[in-house]
Amino acid sequence: MIKRFEIGVYNEVVRSTLRSNRDLPKSNKISPDYENVIYVQRWADSKEDALHKASFEFPKSKGFVIDYCEKIS
């Protein structure tokens, strides 16, 4: 049965750049909002499935960190 999960994600590159009082490069396509944890809701069969799907949407190779994942319904 498909369930709804809340996933918290931030971007380590954005976070470290902004917290060291540097400007994000103009080539950066990631919102500065990702300095903090952003919560999104996604549908998945299990927590593992939700994390797997989130890893494609928020790739580690681009600095994203999945900080939180919990079933909400």
Where are these regions (language model features)?
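A generic structural signal for short, solvent-exposed coil/turn residues
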Residues: 1, 32-34, 58
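A short, structured loop/turn motif at beta-sheet edges
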Residues: 1-5, 43-48
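Short N-terminal "domain-start" leader segments
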Residues: 1-26
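Compositionally biased, intrinsically disordered low-complexity segments
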Residues: 12, 40-41, 69
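Short, low-complexity, polar/charged sequence segments that are solvent-exposed and flexible
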Residues: 25-30, 59-63
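A short, exposed loop/beta-hairpin motif centered on an aromatic-Gly-Thr core
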Residues: 28-45
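Short, mixed-charge low-complexity intrinsically disordered segments
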Residues: 47-73
